[in-house]
């Protein structure tokens, strides 16, 4: 349709070169001029990114099309605050790719008004999507289970950004967009740990074998001990060696079982072995799903 094929007056830009980036029409004199021109079209094309102008226009309505992040001298302190938040979206269980961080990086050092307008709109689009995702969730509760009646609290990102008038206000807004529950903070800390473990290769699976109980002698005890040390259930300083299933190892198994909702009897049976063999990457994915569910809940558990 014509709506889908309309291009803005902004240029395409390759990440490593500005060659061929002349505007389709006369070059705008300022970032504001370029913004005004871009927002006239349904679709703004910035390199490979296609931005919905109608979605972005409300951010500029109250500001009379004045840029929110970028000036003639380039990206400002507010832009850097947002850039950092988008780069670190993985800490919230979200993907920076979803917020076009690569496109933002490609335009970060833009010098022409048209290219700076692209950076401006990419940042606004990133804020719009990120703020909604981290505040209310990527999906709704009903998509996980139609019977759930959870209703995330209303959130207006345009109003929130307008209220963040100073750099300090914006920093506080970005910090408080995620859930403020202590449970969410614990999940975020755990996610960082399991992401590191996954990046380091995780842990080798425990091969199929017999049930292991305290006092047993078995070659797999060495593997079990290494596995439990990888997650910290067995402290590195624990005096536990050899192929005998000793008391420190039994305590470590019980710790692991308790953390995973298993019967904490210290015996490595079928269910405990299966839990031990869940990869670190899958544990990280489980934490991301738990963080997503917390985003659906009221900001105050008592409300």
Sequence positions of predicted segments:
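Low-complexity basic/metal-binding stretches
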Residues: 1-4, 8-23
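Auxiliary tRNA-acceptor-end handling modules of aminoacyl-tRNA synthetases
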Residues: 21, 25-303
């Amino acid at each position: 349709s014509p709506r889908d094929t309309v291009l803005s007056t902004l240029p395409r830009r390759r990440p490593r070169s500005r060659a061929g980036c002349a505007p389709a029409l006369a070059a705008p004199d300022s970032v504001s001029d370029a913004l005004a021109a871009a927002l006239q079209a349904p679709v703004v094309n910035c390199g490979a990114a296609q931005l919905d102008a109608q979605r972005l226009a409300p951010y500029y309505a109250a500001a009379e099309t004045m840029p929110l992040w970028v000036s003639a001298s380039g990206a400002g302190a507010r832009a850097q605050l947002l850039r950092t938040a988008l780069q670190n979206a993985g800490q919230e269980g979200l993907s920076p790719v979803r917020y076009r961080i690569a496109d933002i990086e490609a335009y970060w050092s833009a010098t022409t008004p048209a290219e700076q307008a692209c950076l401006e709109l990419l940042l606004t689009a990133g804020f719009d999507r990120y703020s909604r995702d981290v505040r209310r969730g990527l999906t709704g509760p009903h998509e996980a289970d139609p019977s759930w009646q959870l209703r995330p609290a209303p959130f207006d990102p345009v109003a929130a950004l307008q209220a963040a008038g100073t750099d300090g206000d914006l920093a506080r807004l970005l910090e408080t967009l995620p859930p403020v529950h202590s449970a969410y903070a614990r999940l975020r800390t755990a996610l960082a740990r399991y992401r590191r473990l996954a990046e380091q290769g995780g842990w080798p699976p425990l091969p199929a074998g017999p049930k292991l109980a305290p006092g047993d002698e078995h070659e797999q005890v060495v593997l079990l001990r290494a596995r439990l040390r990888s997650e910290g259930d067995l402290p590195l300083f624990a005096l536990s060696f050899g192929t005998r299933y000793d008391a420190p190892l039994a305590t470590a198994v019980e710790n692991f079982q308790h953390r995973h909702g298993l019967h904490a009897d210290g015996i490595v049976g079928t269910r405990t072995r299966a839990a031990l063999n869940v990869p670190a990457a899958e544990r990280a994915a489980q934490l991301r799903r738990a963080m997503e569910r917390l985003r659906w809940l009221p900001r105050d558990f008592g409300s």
